[in-house]
């Protein structure tokens, strides 16, 4: 997993820093658009930037890990052709390499909550449970899609579209209270609904 991270950014001047710069810029841009542009207010007693980042950071991990793990067999096709190589570890390597970045952002987010004067509470330990559940979900989905993409290469592009729709259909930038009760069950079919909530 460590080697995968190095390889991904090997030809760039900033190297692994790009793994952190892109999500930060995305968060700042969305925050500016929604809070400054659309004047979104704080959610309860939680500043909007914290509420928003709490949903977007898990989504970053979910989408990046699933997308990269899906393409792992085609990306490392030179290894797949080796008979003695254990192919099944490739999607797992991609998930773990994305997990390193996710852990950094979760720690950074916790620090931000403390800086904003929000004291740690016992229920913050739920982060461990939901992170584990999300990792298991990504690994399960990745084994399915990584197998299918070998036979249907367009799946990688289709997944990009699905993940775009998924981000907007998950209550990350909007509150779930906006949805009428009769449609709530549809949104609860999305596993990431429970993580970002």
Segments from the language model and where they lie:
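Hydrophobic transmembrane alpha-helices and immediately adjacent juxtamembrane helices
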Residues: 2-197
């Amino acid at each position: 997993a460590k080697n995968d991270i190095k390889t991904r950014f090997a030809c760039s001047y900033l190297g692994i820093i790009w793994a952190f710069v892109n999500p930060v810029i995305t968060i700042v841009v969305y925050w500016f658009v929604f809070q400054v542009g659309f004047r979104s207010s704080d959610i309860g007693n939680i500043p909007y930037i914290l509420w928003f980042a709490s949903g977007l950071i898990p989504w970053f991990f979910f989408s990046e890990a699933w997308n990269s793990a899906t393409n792992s067999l085609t990306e490392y096709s030179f290894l797949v052709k080796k008979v003695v190589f254990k192919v099944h570890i490739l999607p797992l390597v991609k998930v773990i390499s994305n997990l390193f970045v996710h852990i950094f952002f979760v720690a950074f987010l916790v620090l931000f909550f403390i800086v904003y004067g929000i004291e740690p509470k016992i229920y913050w330990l739920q982060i461990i449970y939901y992170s584990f559940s999300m990792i298991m979900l990504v690994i399960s989905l990745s084994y399915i899609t990584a197998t299918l993409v070998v036979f249907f290469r367009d799946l990688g592009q289709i997944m990009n579209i699905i993940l775009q729709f998924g981000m907007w259909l998950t209550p990350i930038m909007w509150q779930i209270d906006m949805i009428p009760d009769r449609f709530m069950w549809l949104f609860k079919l999305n596993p990431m609904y429970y993580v970002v909530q």
